[in-house]
Amino acid sequence: MKYREENKDLFTVPEYYYLAHCISTDFGMGKGIVVEFNKRFDLKRKLQTKYPDYINQYTHKRIGGDCLLEGRVLNLITKERYFHKPTIITMRLALKKMKQICLEHNIKKIAMPVIGCGLDRLNWNDVSEQIKDIFADTNVEILVCKR
């Protein structure tokens, strides 16, 4: 794995990067960077169309953390409702699912913001350690955009 953090706008990275960010199972996209993701990629409509009963499946199966690939966006599901807060456990489970998707789809480059640490209030040192630990045995390049 190649990991680096840069002071740059996430949405200026080349299009060969997949973009990762956090969402909730209800696909609520009203605050934070997810608003820009939705505006650029029409994610809420696409996810609701593709996964109309996702929240019930997630709750029934007690998944805890997940990741849904839509186009070039990796949607890390770290909480049930938009107003909930994720835990480092749900973040870890979502990151593990993202790794699985990367391996299945031969995804080699991911760019992401400082996930889970804005409105969600996780500690970035904890989250970045999870990312490094989970992706350590891969050849995926992870670029964290800190602007």
Regions inferred by a protein language model and the residue ranges of each:
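Macrodomain-like recognition of ADP-ribose-binding/processing modules
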Residues: 1-147
